[in-house]
């Protein structure tokens, strides 16, 4: 009887890529969704901000309480790396600890039943992965680590400096995936617009875009995590003019007040940030996503109102909102002028109302239109509905199109279809597949 593995990948999609590398190292295990029957349980943790850390710990404790006797519980990833000394002392529930350096050695650690924290942060090169969750879409990691010095962010302390993958490695990985039927790709990293700057080469994202365009069999691609100070008009133009990359721009701006951007050590002011955003918005059929932090130390009422005014004037398609999380080891942690939690909550509520309104407006732009959608399968909303994703959207984060009728028989998961959008139901669109 084959051994069974239950795996949980928390946090970002970059973490998911590393989880998929671990899965490929454990071919003798059969995946199970039921932790109680697993011989091996792996949790790839997130250590980014307070709520993510709490979720990681809670997941490990919950799985420990449900595991069967003689099973092995592994805690891997960012949280494990960031607090390796404390966790190993305080969590006897865990059998094997490993951080962000040993994903490709997970089979060895399990067979030897030993913990390991390599000094070097792991970056995928040509290793096999078992893609999860899709038969047509895959995430591609551009780089690991980050050279930015944002005041609020602890990631460089456990993910290290920027290390980029060579273009030829990325191209080969995509070719291998295309040969297996994958056709839609999302490129991820901590800072995608700094790709290959660790080799002293600027604007290499443009070279990557052109290299990917040469690969036969790709239907679509998009890039996440552009950093404002390293994003250039040339990059925007390369995406806008690409036959493969959709006009998708995800650039976390975090704030728009000059004084706050300076406190956050973002390396760019409001004017240049706005110039980039307006250039992105000027691209036909562009889709803009950003992230904002509310309540960073020193955020005055004036700073906040400036952000509110900008958001009401410049409409994003999607916005991730984060309450400031006070992370030890960061520059912001040492700052005075901390914002009271109740003020942060009030400001979050104001922004959340704007975000929801803008998302509905963005969705309603498609009412009455026929759009290209990937078919993802049966919707979780109802077994009578199919689930689609607009071609330009990133998976999981940008939304779902509920398909309630089709002029075509025998629809295939992973295929692109023309879907006529009939209505909006809450935060979802409803449409019909057209012949």
From Swiss-Prot:
Q: Which cofactor does it need?
A: [4Fe-4S] cluster
Gene Ontology MF: a single term = aspartic acid methylthiotransferase activity
According to its UniProt entry, one GO biological process term is: tRNA modification
Q: How is the cofactor bound?
A: Binds 2 [4Fe-4S] clusters. One cluster is coordinated with 3 cysteines and an exchangeable S-adenosyl-L-methionine.
Q: Which SUPFAM superfamilies match?
A: Radical SAM enzymes
Name its species: Nitratiruptor sp. (strain SB155-2)
In this chain, [4Fe-4S] cluster 1 is annotated as bound at: 12, 46, 78
Q: Where in the cell is it found?
A: Cytoplasm
Q: Which GO terms describe its cellular component?
A: cytosol
Q: Which reaction does it catalyse?
A: L-aspartate(89)-[ribosomal protein uS12]-hydrogen + (sulfur carrier)-SH + AH2 + 2 S-adenosyl-L-methionine = 3-methylsulfanyl-L-aspartate(89)-[ribosomal protein uS12]-hydrogen + (sulfur carrier)-H + 5'-deoxyadenosine + L-methionine + A + S-adenosyl-L-homocysteine + 2 H(+)
Family note: Belongs to the methylthiotransferase family. RimO subfamily.
Look up the EC number in the record and give it. 2.8.4.4
| Positions of transmembrane segments | none
Q: What's the short name of a Pfam family annotated to this entry? A: TRAM_2
Q: In UniProt terms, what function does this protein have?
A: Catalyzes the methylthiolation of an aspartic acid residue of ribosomal protein uS12.
Alphabetized InterPro entries for the sequence: Elp3/MiaA/NifB-like_rSAM, Methylthiotransferase, Methylthiotransferase_CS, Methylthiotransferase_N, Methylthiotransferase_N_sf, NA-bd_OB-fold, Ribosomal_uS12_MeSTrfase_RimO, rSAM
Q: Boundaries of each Radical SAM core domain copy?
A: 132-361
Top enzyme class: transferase
* Protein name per UniProt: Ribosomal protein uS12 methylthiotransferase RimO
């Amino acid at each position: 009887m084959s051994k069974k593995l239950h795996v949980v990948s928390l946090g970002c999609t970059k973490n998911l890529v590393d989880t998929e590398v671990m899965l490929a190292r454990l071919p003798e295990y059969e995946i199970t969704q039921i932790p109680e029957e697993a011989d091996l349980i792996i949790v790839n943790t997130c250590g980014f901000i307070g709520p993510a850390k709490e979720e990681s710990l809670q997941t490990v404790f919950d799985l420990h309480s449900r595991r069967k006797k003689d099973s092995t519980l592994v805690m891997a990833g960012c949280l494990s790396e960031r607090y390796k000394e404390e966790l190993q002392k305080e969590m006897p529930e865990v059998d094997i600890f490993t951080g962000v350096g040993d994903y490709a050695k997970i089979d060895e650690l399990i067979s030897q039943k030993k913990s390991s924290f390599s000094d070097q942060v792991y970056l995928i090169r040509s290793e096999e992965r078992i893609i999860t969750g899709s038969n047509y879409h895959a995430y591609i990691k551009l780089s690991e680590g980050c050279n930015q010095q944002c005041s609020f962010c602890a990631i460089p302390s456990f993910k290290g400096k920027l290390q980029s993958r060579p273009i030829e490695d990325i191209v080969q990985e995509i070719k291998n995936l295309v040969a297996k039927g994958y056709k839609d790709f999302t490129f991820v990293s901590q800072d995608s617009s700094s790709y290959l700057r660790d080799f002293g080469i600027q604007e290499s994202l443009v070279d990557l875009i052109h290299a990917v365009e040469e690969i036969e069999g790709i239907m679509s691609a998009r890039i996440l995590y552009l950093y404002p100070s390293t994003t250039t008009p040339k990059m925007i133009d390369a995406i806008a003019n690409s036959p493969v990359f959709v006009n998708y721009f995800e650039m976390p701006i975090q704030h728009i007040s000059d004084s706050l951007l300076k406190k956050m050590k973002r390396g760019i002011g409001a004017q240049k940030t706005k110039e980039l955003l307006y250039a992105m918005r000027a691209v036909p059929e562009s889709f803009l996503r950003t992230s904002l932090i509310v309540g960073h130390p020193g955020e005055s009422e004036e700073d906040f109102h400036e952000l509110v005014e900008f958001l009401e004037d410049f409409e994003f398609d999607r916005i991730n909102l984060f309450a400031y999380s006070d992370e030890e080891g960061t520059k912001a942690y040492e700052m005075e002028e901390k914002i009271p939690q109740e003020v942060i909550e009030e400001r979050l509520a104001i922004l959340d109302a704007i975000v929801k309104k803008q998302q509905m407006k963005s969705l309603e732009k498609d009412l009455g239109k026929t759009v290209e959608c990937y078919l993802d399968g049966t919707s979780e909303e109802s077994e009578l509905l199919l689930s689609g994703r607009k071609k330009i959207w990133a998976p999981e984060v940008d939304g779902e199109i509920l398909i309630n009728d089709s002029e075509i028989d025998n629809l295939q998961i992973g295929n692109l279809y023309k879907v006529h959008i009939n209505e909006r139901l809450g935060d979802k669109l409803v449409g019909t597949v057209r012949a």
